[in-house]
Amino acid sequence: MEKLTLTPISRVEGEINLPGSKSLSNRALLLAALATGTTQVTNLLDSDDIRHMLNALKALGVKYELSDDKTVCVVEGIGGAFKVQNGLSLFLGNAGTAMRPLAAALCLKGAETAQIILTGEPRMKERPIKHLVDALRQVGAEVQYLENEGYPPLAISNSGLQGGKVQIDGSISSQFLTALLMSAPLAESDMEIEIIGDLVSKPYIDITLSMMNDFGITVENRDYKTFLVKGKQGYVAPQGNYLVEGDASSASYFLASGAIKGKVKVTGIGKKSIQGDRLFADVLEKMGAKITWGEDFIQAEQSPLKGVDMDMNHIPDAAMTIATTALFAEGETVIRNIYNWRVKETDRLTAMATELRKVGAEVEEGEDFIRIQPLALENFQHAEIETYNDHRMAMCFSLIALSNTEVTILDPNCTAKTFPTYFRELEKLSVR
């Protein structure tokens, strides 16, 4: 297995322009495909998950032109449901941001009835999709599980979504609700979506609603408990370029490195960003970092850090970065209400606890929380960090190099899921 050893970094300094957001890129591509008109998507992320979405759209008959650097995509919208070839099988890797929304969109009524299969990597077959399928079936969708009940692969018929009242469990992933919301305007009649349990990751729903609005669809949001969507509508391509914001989750590693040991400015997101993970900077500020907000940048500067005890359900991806940042703070850090870490690219709670212990940390792993004790710079131990084919594990643990000890990252190329050039960018900012 390939490995990368990072030698100790004495300080980080500089500016980085963020690649496009994964969540926004795949939503933009799907909305552009369903819309009437042509959309020019700019600052698209070039990564595995986006490639899976693009390959799926091509197989579904969507025409697009991708620039040489793969960051600009001109999509010709099909103005409604996909024209599905019967028996087509789409392989979506481990891209949840492609699997969930496509599963809903492929239920929409096509001109000719057809069945399609959605599948992916072995890990995708372990990632739950039952809450979405249960909701889709309530509004008339025909979806079957091909292997294990509640998990992909799925066989989906494009027989239509009827609309009406539907209940969806919001406690595991907001992507299920996002998938249903994005397809609801193309249903046969109005849809009233009621959330069962507490909705996790609400800021990701804000992203979905904001982007649907950009493509001409308004949703009535009643305090995240009920959503009303008119049926028999159509998306309309927005005028001019459709800019994908920089990835706020990817910003977290650079902002944390600045807060621990230097000064880093990230551009491509700012105070007007629609991404919830921009609030990661507020957590760093609570820990003691100096944070500066601009219209299109956030800057983090080193200052003594102290541990925090916080509910981070609203920023689950960026919260992982707090787990490694906590090692450099004074006092313990507790990250709470993060059960959904367990259903991501890997079981991130167990993975994080296991790898933190390897570098010498004292960690308590609860069912939905993690408690981390800090380490003195000289007490970090050199370790080979297992990344579990999870891009965020690789990027989080790169921060260990800000101690007095080197760190070895196994399978560093797993960052290709969202940020193929991550280690190159980190190197540019590093002073040894």
Swiss-Prot record:
Enzyme class, spelled out: transferase
Record localization: Cytoplasm
Active-site feature positions: 317
Amino acids binding 3-phosphoshikimate: 22-23, 27, 173-175, 201, 317, 340, 344
InterPro entries referenced in this protein's UniProt entry, alphabetically: Enolpyruvate_Tfrase_dom, Enolpyruvate_Tfrase_sf, EPSP_synthase, EPSP_synthase_CS, RNA3'P_cycl/enolpyr_Trfase_a/b
Pathway: Metabolic intermediate biosynthesis; chorismate biosynthesis; chorismate from D-erythrose 4-phosphate and phosphoenolpyruvate: step 6/7
Keywords for this protein: Amino-acid biosynthesis, Aromatic amino acid biosynthesis, Cytoplasm, Transferase
GO cellular component entries: cytoplasm
Name assigned to this protein: 3-phosphoshikimate 1-carboxyvinyltransferase
Originating organism: Mannheimia haemolytica
